[in-house]
Amino acid sequence: MTPRPIRHQYEDLMRHVFEHGTAKGDRTGTGTKSVFGHQMRFDLSEGFPLVTTKKVHLKSIILELLWFLRGDSNVRWLQERGCTIWDEWARDDGSLGPVYGVQWRSWPTPDGGHIDQIQQVIDTLKTHPDSRRIIVSAWNVAELDRMALMPCHAFFQFYVAPSQVAGEPGKLSCQLYQRSADIFLGVPFNIASYALLTHMVAQQCDLQVGDFIWTGGDCHIYSNHFEQVRTQLARQPYAYPTLQIKRRPASIFDYAYEDFEVVGYEHHPAIKAPVAV
């Protein structure tokens, strides 16, 4: 068995922003070092891109993605499963307004209807895989003011590279545009979440996985994360683990937490840090 390569795109981004970022204010009043515009590419056939220089809480990543795919925008479902990552932004009744899941699954139309963007993606990949319009947007300008937190990971596109071998399935890649990227806390979640989504969509559409491309806008490290970043950058990364999906449900919306297993996740200890709200 060929050993998996050790990749460090994420750590390179962190180091670049930490060493060369511009001091910049922000909405939370915390202060940041920031760089505008960066891209990372992860070959999903090499392994599942779960950051190894600190332990990342995989359960929260999986549950949050399933919550998005439910079209849900109330934290109760997450809380019932022990996931509290959205609690800081929730209103008293648990609602967050029309955030990610609502836009993904039921984008409102002027005539009172709704568009299920995720179902459109699946349908188009199966019928027109060469389409350049296989896109999901969470950035609904008309509804931003009603959201507890405007979308940070705002827009993503799928792409199928046809196989050069007759009879083999094509390779599915996904590119995400993240307008606001909290490098220490948020970005490891976002990378793993969209890599997982790419695996799920590929399974549903009988495709192989290709690349996950992460494109960031305002890439920043909060000033109250500087010590944690120094700790993390002193560590050497390990090879990424692998992802196993244990069953193929009837649709993209029918996966359960128990369907996923990450194998061989070697990692350094977790590093705690405050969330900027």
UniProtKB/Swiss-Prot annotation:
Q: Where does the source fall among the domains of life?
A: Bacteria
- Record's GO cellular component terms: cytosol
Q: Where does dUMP bind?
A: R27, R132, R133, R179, S180, A181, D182, N190, H220, I221, Y222
Main location, first listed in the record: cytoplasm
What does the subunit comment say? Homodimer.
Function, as annotated, reads:
Catalyzes the reductive methylation of 2'-deoxyuridine-5'-monophosphate (dUMP) to 2'-deoxythymidine-5'-monophosphate (dTMP) while utilizing 5,10-methylenetetrahydrofolate (mTHF) as the methyl donor and reductant in the reaction, yielding dihydrofolate (DHF) as a by-product. This enzymatic reaction provides an intracellular de novo source of dTMP, an essential precursor for DNA biosynthesis.
What protein name is recorded for this chain?
Thymidylate synthase
Q: What organism is listed for this UniProt entry?
A: Acidovorax sp. (strain JS42)
Q: What is the lineage of its organism?
A: Bacteria, Pseudomonadati, Pseudomonadota, Betaproteobacteria, Burkholderiales
Q: Which gene encodes it?
A: thyA
